[in-house]
Amino acid sequence: MKTSQKFNIDFDYNELHHDAPKAVQAPLIGLTGNFSDNKLSLLPGYYTSILKAGAVPVILPPTEDADILISFLNRIDGLLFTGGADINPLFFQEEPIRELQDINPYRDRQELLLARLAADRQIPILGICRGVQVLNAAFGGSLYQDIHSQMEGTRIKHSQQLDRSFASHTIEIEPGSLLEKIMGCSHVAVNSFHHQAVREAAPGFRVSARAKDGVIEAIESTEGKSILGVQWHPECFILNGDESMMPLFHWLTHEAKSFAKAKELHSRILTLDSHCDTPMFFHENIHFESRDPKIKVDL
């Protein structure tokens, strides 16, 4: 439906209602927002890229309420961790160094929990900038609080003054990686706005790209899960009409569609694997569709 310039809501409503049966059910992608100055915000590149990839973006406000987090995860088909402030180093067992910049306590705990809970549920995940650091910290990896003071050697410029929608340095993608498959090449020019970075990839992850100075630019799951994190800001490019980074968002949307289909299938079909050759007997009022400590159903 195109935006009407006639200010006729009845016409718009009737047109939308008429086309509703033809609409394709798009996957729902959850995005973490940036909470500061008593405002929840989301930069346009994120939702523009998700919409252009054919998915529906929905933002999650900051909360540590377990019921809200679980309800959110039960409804989405994919998850995108957005950029933002530094991560509190106490979450990866380090004391803050002098070069640490602003941290956001409203986001840290929520996003670290979300990462683990989403991975448990096989929800496809894309982490961007701070998001790749969230993924790494959530699963036991380490971070550089400041690459300029903690990494040896000469650094290239990782905090460009150039407009965010233009690339400022190149990265090398690991052969055979998921990222190489998505991008279709081994060298990519990216933008850069960070001073923290992944130090060592978490267990269950591999490094899939580095900058020329050795800074880790991407990690991905080695366990067959649809989890990928990148250090640059791919969402910015579309705002300049540059679609070179859209493969990342198409990948997330494709994986989210597959996950949505799997959820729908599993909601109708129950598979029971006892892992034993002897008969099993269950007491009355057992409900296999929910967790039960007596039978340890894994959902």
Sequence positions of predicted segments:
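Conserved G/P- and acidic residue-centered "switch" motifs that form tight phosphate/ATP-binding loops
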Residues: 129
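Protein kinase-like catalytic core scaffold
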Residues: 217, 226-228, 270
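Histidine-centered catalytic micro-motifs
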Residues: 192-197, 229-234, 271-279
